[in-house]
């Protein structure tokens, strides 16, 4: 189950990276970008924990949040 959800999430993230992201200006304040962070988190921790980490990261990515290098733990 976790494997299938991971593949589904990775597919959705890749769709965003290749089809939607090029149409909007870059805004991510971190490296790696939030979408790349999500890919790495899902690959490393699986669908549930990876998605939780990605959501927390996206919630921190705003003008008043942090910035800089923030790798997947």
Swiss-Prot record:
It comes from the Bacteria. The keyword Ribosomal protein does not apply. Its main location: membrane. Pfam families: YidD. The keyword Ion transport does not apply. It is found in: Cell inner membrane. It is a peripheral membrane protein. InterPro entries: Membr_insert_effic_factor_YidD. SMART domains: Haemolytic (SM01234). GO terms for cellular component: plasma membrane. Keywords: Cell inner membrane, Cell membrane, Membrane. Belongs to the UPF0161 family. Could be involved in insertion of integral membrane proteins into the membrane. This is Putative membrane protein insertion efficiency factor. It comes from Neisseria gonorrhoeae (strain ATCC 700825 / FA 1090). The lineage of its organism: Bacteria, Pseudomonadati, Pseudomonadota, Betaproteobacteria, Neisseriales.
